[in-house]
């Protein structure tokens, strides 16, 4: 399961700065879908091959009535749900009573906690960090979040238990005490150039696996009723797979020879209905379920307007690149006029996910539930279907013939060839000249062209653009071996002619 890292600390210690730096590229993926609401407190990030969820808990002030009463409930929830806590303090401001109150609470939780002294750029880092030893943490780590100094190394240490390579030993100083991480390179989320070999590994990993289906949505939309309907119809023996108390319930089942694993989340509460703690717990469970799923089934209540929280859940699913099916529940009992209004509203607000199948169902009575399987399978097949380089290149050239790429700095962008870069979601890698300069409008055109030509339904498509290297670049006017030989022949011919 994907790890969750929580940023904890009093206001203005740099939590948001660190959050924005670490999640900036991953968050940008949502921008491909205009009109989508993004929750900025929760972000996906990736360090090497390790994906993780980062939570900005907001500021905590425990100075007046004690940390248990003054902490925001969502921050408490995030601490409980997190696998790792990064406790941030301000190296310039020094130790405060709020820091001490927060540290006391964190020590009582026995959670893997890293004390991070931020804002040490331009000052004596060791001197600024010394007083924070009073907080009783086993180690003190030093970073400058605004410049990214030490961030990568800190994350490597925090995520070491979840990564294949443990890097803690190589980063420990001679005394094994204060680890100054600022000498290491800045945190950069560079895009890895994906190859056909990467795609084949991805494809092999997905073979002979059950379809993992996460059923998500706010409470009272009928999610539990739908799960019971599905399991009741299939007459399967239900048992809970091993997991921690904070994980979702995994339920294996089979239908018509196809194996599934249903991931039952706790749902996401709307603020005002219940307290913040339960809501935040639910968000984290849902995020982890989405990451672990192949296909996400979002359940929406037909009798309530689609909410920003519904759109935020969609954003998480799209950001994770998951296949998507949408079920509009409680459709029975609505008159035709109301149904038309609901359809119109859904078309208006869900236009950016027109690739997802939309079903109108009644989980209580079973109406339309059977058709969900068809869309789930269609989405999964689309997300994992192997497509060869020749086919992808042919489709790319057809798109280029139909609509030429624009000019960039007086030169026409040239698309050379395309190949698969991964699956679930399908990732297409396009090579060419100046392809990274293509405008968003042309990238969307290519995405839609591939979708239509390859009949991909139910899953987002990602395209990575790689500039082809010029084999003559940086040669400084040097001739190739064949050119050198030709030059010698020409010089020899001229000399012979002059002798005559």
From Swiss-Prot:
It comes from the Bacteria. Residues 385-469 form the KH-like domain. One of its GO terms (biological process) is ribosome biogenesis. Residues 486-500 have a biased composition (Basic residues). GTP 1 binds at residues 9-16, 56-60, 118-121. GTP 2 binds at residues 217-224, 264-268, 329-332. CDD domains: EngA1, EngA2. Keywords: GTP-binding, Nucleotide-binding, Repeat, Ribosome biogenesis. GO terms for molecular function: GTP binding; ribosome binding. Residues 481-500 are annotated as: Disordered. InterPro entries: G_ENGA (IPR031166), GTP-bd (IPR006073), GTPase_Der (IPR016484), KH_dom-like (IPR032859), KH_dom-like_a/b (IPR015946), P-loop_NTPase (IPR027417), Small_GTP-bd (IPR005225). Residues 3-166, 211-384 form the EngA-type G domain. PANTHER family: GTPASE DER. GTPase that plays an essential role in the late steps of ribosome biogenesis. NCBIfam families: GTPase_EngA, small_GTP. Belongs to the TRAFAC class TrmE-Era-EngA-EngB-Septin-like GTPase superfamily. EngA (Der) GTPase family. Associates with the 50S ribosomal subunit. HAMAP family: GTPase_Der. This is GTPase Der. It comes from Aliivibrio salmonicida (strain LFI1238).
